[in-house]
Amino acid sequence: MSHVSNSTDEVVRNYLAAKSMVTSLKAFDQESSFAKEANYQVDRCIDEMTDAIDKHDVDTLCAMWESWNARVFHSLDTEGIKQAQCYEASAYRLFLVRCVQKKNISKCNEFFRKMSSLTLNNPQWADWFAFPYNHHAKDTEPFRKYFDKTWIEIYYVSLHNFLSTSLANVSPSVIGTIVEGIARDPTGNDHVDFDEDLIDDFAVIAQCSAPVKRGHSKPSLRNLLKSLTSSKKPSPSTD
């Protein structure tokens, strides 16, 4: 899928250049470079999660998982979604353990209030309501492993790998899908409806990149992108 990403980046760059958006183009190049080098910033995501746990920041922690579920994990298969739910539950339990270790019981109560939709009437969470008041939780199932440093380290490594893999499988953007289709079948007639303003904007790019034959009807975005990609291809040798 890397060629699709590169083609999409090129379309965006051409668009910004056509609009003379020099500052935006520079910012886009910087952000694209940073995203690639940081491997979608997985390391930073994990750091932010551990920081939220250490600071007893339930709002940030829950918001992060809500974002991951909506933007990344939603595209997984059934088994993958179940795995994501297990990682999420473990993150919340590590949060509770950290709060108990720091004797911040009020944050535990805050968590249960805000996450009642997840924890109430859920057999997997039944034992955890009494956890903040269990003085021997460290040596009691099912809490014991969440105090184990080795298990915690393995959890974070596993979560990092899972998040990296999930990000790699995220469905490409609409434009990326079209570009991939053009590369796979240059003569295809797939039809997709787009907003007219979007088509007009990309018509500007096409005019700057390659000649486009005009008819009485508005050109399709697919054909405009096709003109862009075809203009990049080397001409066949006549030797």
Curated annotation (Swiss-Prot):
GO MF term set: phosphatidylinositol 3-kinase inhibitor activity
Name this polypeptide is given: Suppressor of organelle fusion 1
Keyword Cytoplasm: yes
Protein role: Together with sorf-2 negatively regulates the levels of phosphatidylinositol 3-phosphate (PtdIns3P) to enable the conversion of early endosomes to late endosomes. Binds to sorf-2 and the sorf-1-sorf-2 complex likely acts through bec-1, a non-catalytic subunit of phosphatidylinositol 3-kinase (PI3K), to suppress PI3K activity, thereby negatively regulating endosomal PtdIns3P levels.
InterPro entries for this protein: ARMC9_CTLH-like_dom, WDR91
Free-text disruption phenotype from the record: Coelomocytes contain larger early and late endosomes enriched with PtdIns3P. Delayed conversion of early endosomes to late endosomes with early endosomes retaining PtdInsP3 for a longer duration of time which may possibly be due to a delay in either the turnover or transport of PtdIns3P out of the endosome. This leads to continuous fusion of early endosomes which continues until rab-5 is displaced and rab-7 is recruited. Double knockout with sorf-2 results in a similar phenotype as the individual single sorf-1 knockout.
Gene assigned in the entry: sorf-1
Oligomeric form and interacting partners: Interacts with sorf-2; the interaction is direct. Interacts with bec-1.
GO cellular component: cytosol; early endosome; early endosome lumen; early endosome membrane; endosome membrane; late endosome; late endosome lumen; late endosome membrane
Protein family according to the UniProt entry: Belongs to the WD repeat WDR91 family.
